[in-house]
Amino acid sequence: MISKDKLKKLVGWEALKYIKSNTIIGVGTGSTVNYFIEALSSIKQQIEGVVSSSQHSSNQLKKLGIPLYNLNNLNDLEIYIDSADEIDLHMQMIKGGGGALTKEKIIAFAAKKFICIVDDSKQVNILGRKGPIPVEVIPMARSVVSKSLICLGGLPEYRNGVITDNGNSILDVYNMNITDASLLEQRINNIPGVVSVGLFAQRKADIALIGTQKGIKILNSN
């Protein structure tokens, strides 16, 4: 039986096949992405550099000698590679377990192509049944946002002791019945004090590389 870590490593290396020479790549955050960053270091001479979604990923990229770029200084971004906490058959995702959801969402929006790399434990039929939806909030709005999330049917829990790279707080929302992920994403985003929500339904993955016991399964959004 192939271990979960081995599956993560396999999809991390598989993602290299989608990278063109002399381009700048968006890179996400998480344990699967850590394997991708290791793989990326093997072709670092062939790429221009990387836009990173978190300080954690930036630190790893710097150690490996991979140049970092500011998204504001780029005209376009060809590709973004990141993992997910959950992904469904429609390529909609829950992300943000590592707390980097806002920057992840910005880079995903900016990129022409979004590739999600996961092991098959992350693939679900319905989002939100296995874990919470992370919501990044302005600290002073935590209570107000929590009340609004309860009105939407959720059970928000403050992620104690966690401050995002943007200086904000995280609410993990349990018990949310997700029948229309895109609509729910919009509703949560519209709550004053919400910075971003870890539902990636409006900007879905274009390609998913899923590590399974039988090999790598590839899903396309179209």
From Swiss-Prot:
Record-level GO cellular component terms: cytosol
GO biological process, one term: D-ribose metabolic process
EC number assigned by the record: 5.3.1.6
Annotated catalytic residues: E104
Matching Pfam families: Rib_5-P_isom_A (PF06026)
Enzyme class, spelled out: isomerase
Superkingdom, natural source: Bacteria
Binding-site list for substrate: T29, G30, S31, T32, D82, S83, A84, D85, K95, G96, G97, G98, K122
Keywords linked to the UniProt accession: Isomerase
Molecular function as annotated in GO: ribose-5-phosphate isomerase activity
Keyword Ribonucleoprotein appears in the UniProt entry: no
Pathway the protein contributes to: Carbohydrate degradation; pentose phosphate pathway; D-ribose 5-phosphate from D-ribulose 5-phosphate (non-oxidative stage): step 1/1
Catalytic activity: aldehydo-D-ribose 5-phosphate = D-ribulose 5-phosphate
Family, as annotated: Belongs to the ribose 5-phosphate isomerase family.
Free-text function comment from the UniProt entry: Catalyzes the reversible conversion of ribose-5-phosphate to ribulose 5-phosphate.
Description of how the protein assembles with itself and partners: Homodimer.
The protein's name in its UniProt record: Ribose-5-phosphate isomerase A
Organism (species): Blochmanniella floridana
Gene: rpiA
